[in-house]
């Protein structure tokens, strides 16, 4: 099965399990590293996830994936929090994390550039609003290739 199909199937199977546990499915990754395959599922909830949350989701997903067997190779299943530099994947993330510092990369230039680091203001319609270098700017959500929270000390 192609990588994209694997990710799509895993997300479809994982989402109800994660939601049933009162958690958010942040992201799913399938990667080959050092000759080994890894399926990583990132979960979160307000206040952060506990090891018990990860264990619960891991056990349920492991059983479901064993039944479906979508991945022909042997792989390691990892379930964890997305970390303090979590990716911002959904429009709602920019509302939830308003006031936080983020790094954003766009598919094509916005106001002449593709990389931005600034404070998230929120969403305005379909645009992410950020305070970048003392100036408020709007970045179309559909133009965002990747975005992550930045660690502040």
From Swiss-Prot:
Could you tell me which CDD domains the record lists for this protein? YlxS_C (cd01734)
**GO BP term, example:** ribosomal small subunit assembly
Q: Point out the signal peptide segment.
A: none
Q: Which UniProt keywords apply?
A: Cytoplasm, Ribosome biogenesis
Per the record, GO CC terms? cytosol
Q: Say what the protein does.
A: Required for maturation of 30S ribosomal subunits.
Do you know which HAMAP family this protein is assigned to?
RimP (MF_01077)
Q: What is this protein called?
A: Ribosome maturation factor RimP
